[in-house]
């Protein structure tokens, strides 16, 4: 199990990403636009750098919904490999079963 503080930190990051998503997207379009002047582009870069570091989506970490484990996460199921195997063995994941050949 992941520490409660780590789960809380990830939840806080998710809130920050949602809060600043539109602002970040607008600044990035200004930076990427060939029509914007160098001065506008530079101002947009400075404003983007002034935003909170955790408001970037790249800083979010996928975690298991049950345990909070950061490694071995399977996005399709939202679980770590360990919890997915346990759920599969109990028959809780429809259409998924242990391989046998």
UniProtKB/Swiss-Prot annotation:
Any single biological process term in GO: translation
GO CC aspect terms: cytoplasm; small ribosomal subunit
InterPro entries in the cross-refs: Ribosomal_uS14 (IPR001209), Ribosomal_uS14_bac/plastid (IPR023036), Ribosomal_uS14_CS (IPR018271)
Gene Ontology molecular function, alphabetical: rRNA binding; structural constituent of ribosome
The organism's place on the tree of life at top rank: Bacteria
Keywords noted in UniProt: Ribonucleoprotein, Ribosomal protein, RNA-binding, rRNA-binding
Record carries keyword Phosphoprotein: no
Function: Binds 16S rRNA, required for the assembly of 30S particles and may also be responsible for determining the conformation of the 16S rRNA at the A site.
Record-given protein name: Small ribosomal subunit protein uS14
Similarity annotation: Belongs to the universal ribosomal protein uS14 family.
Subunit and partners: Part of the 30S ribosomal subunit. Contacts proteins S3 and S10.
Entry-linked SUPFAM superfamilies: Glucocorticoid receptor-like (DNA-binding domain)
């Amino acid at each position: 199990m992941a520490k409660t503080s780590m789960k809380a930190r990830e939840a806080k990051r998710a809130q920050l990403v949602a809060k600043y998503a539109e602002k970040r997207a607008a600044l990035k379009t200004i930076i990427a636009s060939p029509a914007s002047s160098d001065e506008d582009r530079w101002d947009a870069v400075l404003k983007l750098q002034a935003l909170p570091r955790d408001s970037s989506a790249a800083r979010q970490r996928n975690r298991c919904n049950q345990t909070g484990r950061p490694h071995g996460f399977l996005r399709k199921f939202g679980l770590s490999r360990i919890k997915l195997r346990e759920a599969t063995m109990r028959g809780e994941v429809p259409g998924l079963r242990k391989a046998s050949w």
